Design a protein with these regions (language model features):
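A binding-site-centric feature that preferentially detects glycan-recognition modules on secreted/surface proteins
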Residues: 1-37, 43-251
Length: 251
């Protein structure tokens, strides 16, 4: 039989930063054109502890995400906008101000996402946190989308940061300030040496790092993904059609 390689191995995670695409506005269109979704904070938390041979790359670098953080006029309130559709639409022609998308009147109020008032949680912002504070933090809970994931990530990363860097506190949340008009920014998470901080004041035109995730990888994080061969597809189709024929005969 002729030996043809008809399997396409899909990269579950692909870095879109390059010399020709250094910022968020340049990278996002490439992610979308490659039929991928931008990495989320939750994706990163799933991947970092279980990255196999590439684990040091995942742990020691910062990563931008497709999760957005929207601020109201004046910046007294903010929303965590998971998998922001507005961020997925940006490109090099997108208008921005001070590195943020400016939201038109009424858009902030319409955005779906958990809202927080800075004054209510000011004691938990702009500083490093203990592991227990992270696990109970309402913003980290919103970003992780799953309390068990947040607990696992916090325990493992704190243990490693203690061993490698003698850190007892980390994972602080650092937000934008002085937002005079409603804005939307992309969230990113720092590497472990920088204490795995959450940063919500990303400048979209600075040097950034976006990772595109293959849709198939969302259900199989960390695993290689292969498209089935033509032979496999035909075999399954024939099997399915044969079963259908049997069912029809029974009727």
């Amino acid at each position: 039989m002729e030996n043809l390689d008809l399997n396409d191995t899909i990269e579950p995670y692909k870095n879109f930063r390059s010399d020709n695409a250094k910022n968020y506005l340049a990278q996002m269109p490439l992610v979308i054109a490659d039929n991928r979704v931008p990495l989320s904070v939750a994706n990163l938390m799933e991947r970092r502890p279980h990255a196999g041979k590439s684990v040091s790359t995942w742990k020691d670098n910062y990563f931008d995400t497709g999760d957005g953080i929207a601020y109201n006029a004046g910046g007294s309130k903010f929303k965590i906008v998971l998998d922001s559709q507005d961020l997925r639409k940006v490109n090099l022609k997108t208008e921005q101000k001070n590195g943020a998308l400016v939201l038109e009147d009424g858009i902030y109020e319409q955005l779906q996402g958990q809202e927080f008032t800075k004054e209510d949680i000011k004691s938990l912002l702009e500083r490093d946190l203990s592991a227990d504070e992270v696990k109970a933090h309402p913003v980290w809970k919103a970003l992780a989308r799953n309390d068990a994931l947040l607990t696992e990530y916090t325990d493992k990363m704190f243990a490693e940061m203690k061993t490698r860097f003698t850190y007892d506190k980390a994972m602080g949340l650092y937000l934008a300030s002085g937002e005079k008009v409603p804005t939307l920014r992309a969230a990113y998470v720092d590497g472990l040496e920088s204490r795995s901080q959450f940063v919500g004041r990303c400048n979209l035109v600075d040097g950034r790092r976006l990772v595109g995730v293959a849709p198939e990888a969302l259900n199989a994080p960390g695993k290689a993904i292969e498209r089935p061969s033509l032979e496999t597809v035909l075999h399954l189709a024939n099997q399915y059609l044969g079963q259908g024929e049997i069912e029809l005969r029974k009727r």
